[in-house]
Amino acid sequence: MADFIDAFLIGDGEEAAAEIALCWTSAKREGLGRRARLVRLANLEGVYVPSLYATHVDADTGLEVVSGPALEPVPFPIRRRVLENLDRFPFPDDGPVGGPEAIFDRMSIEVARGCTEGCRFCQAGMIYRPVRERDPLEVVRTVERALEKSGQDEVSLTALSTADVSAISPLI
């Protein structure tokens, strides 16, 4: 993939998106070349730059596996970025789509990430760990603002397993 994709963010992007943009523009302003900018990006938590890592084909699976840094001192293994406190980044209470009634029939508000069940078959349940929930009062405020701004009269509370959200009863 190194031929096509410069960098991947592994994990949650709310904090990382701004860090990546600032890192890249700062390095560019400093006159660093492309490879040096990629090395700088790779040193941000959760950023994987394929061109900076060596890979090999696993004999058992036939899959290409990252074996470590190719040349530059970059982190290995790459740690997944986790946003510990969802409330630091409030869920948007208005959408970028004008006239949402033409496309959606309700507002969708994220109330939690992750899942408490740990089912072995569920990739999403494993990927989005640990479980994090939004503050119920913030959810209510977001719902009120979203309904006021959108003109909708319905809201869906979304999570991998909404019924398992600890404050779901009072929210309903």
Regions found by a protein language model. Name each.
Residues F4-A7, R34, F76, A102, ...:
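A general structural-boundary detector
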Residues M1-P69:
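Glycine-rich beta-alpha loop elements in corrinoid/cobalamin-binding modules
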Residues L83-I172:
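Radical SAM [4Fe-4S] cluster-binding motif and immediate context
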Residues P50, V57-S108:
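N-terminal [4Fe-4S]-dependent radical SAM core
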Residues G13-A16, R40, R81-N85, L171:
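Alpha-helical structural motif
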